[in-house]
């Protein structure tokens, strides 16, 4: 059995997703990831990652035979293309410095065949930051979260605790006032070094282990 990633272009109307997933389920194929959106031309787009496929060509032919399906394309999975994700959240000045370190280190590992991608969002405000932290748990393939700011606590700290508890995501924080440093897995003073260490913590091609430094400050 094999795995496959498909992008399916469809007409945009109710019931299309149900029809497509019905075809897939009838073959005992497992859907491991799905993403739906409407393209600029008004057509529906469904991206799916599937596993336990006995006959890939037969599945694709069945999908193409549907009157609601306009096109089907095969891809490598997002895990294979973009790999693990590191999310950097906080103030713009700090986020940019953390991103510099993370991108430089990710480049070293990606050259060796690994795939690590860096996502950033500069935000201010306790409520906005807490909401963004909680939303990290709903994003796919997130391996680490870096909190890059000058003061974080309260609702942000509670959001970090939730993300760690429910999604087992490594959290690295810059050294700053506020209680968030008490719940982070690692606290780093230099923002560029924080970015570097976030990549080292999740890379399969690194010898660094977050377990050996968990709870420490640098």
UniProtKB/Swiss-Prot annotation:
Regions that span the bilayer: none
Pfam families: ACT, DUF5612
ACT domain location: 5-77
Domain of life from the UniProt record: Archaea
Protein name: Uncharacterized protein MTH_1235
Organism (species): Methanothermobacter thermautotrophicus (strain ATCC 29096 / DSM 1053 / JCM 10044 / NBRC 100330 / Delta H)
């Amino acid at each position: 059995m094999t795995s496959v990633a498909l992008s399916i272009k469809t007409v945009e109307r109710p019931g299309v997703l149900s029809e497509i997933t019905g075809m897939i389920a009838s073959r005992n194929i497992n859907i491991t990831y799905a993403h739906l959106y409407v393209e600029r031309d008004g057509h529906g787009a469904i991206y799916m990652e599937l596993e336990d496929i006995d006959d890939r060509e037969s599945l694709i032919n069945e999908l193409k035979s549907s009157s609601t399906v306009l096109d089907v394309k095969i891809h490598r999975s997002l895990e294979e293309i973009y790999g693990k994700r590191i999310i950097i959240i906080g103030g713009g000045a700090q986020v940019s410095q953390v991103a510099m370190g993370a991108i430089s280190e990710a480049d070293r590992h990606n050259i060796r065949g690994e795939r690590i991608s860096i996502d950033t969002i500069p935000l201010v405000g306790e409520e906005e930051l807490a909401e963004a932290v909680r939303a990290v748990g709903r994003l796919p393939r997130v391996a680490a979260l870096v909190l890059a700011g000058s003061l974080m606590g309260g609702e942000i700290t509670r959001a970090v605790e939730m993300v760690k508890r429910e999604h087992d995501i490594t959290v690295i924080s810059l050294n700053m006032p506020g209680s968030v440093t008490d719940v982070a897995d690692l606290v780093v003073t230099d923002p560029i070094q924080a970015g570097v260490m976030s990549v080292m913590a999740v890379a399969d091609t690194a010898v660094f282990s977050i377990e050996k430094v968990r709870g420490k400050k640098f």
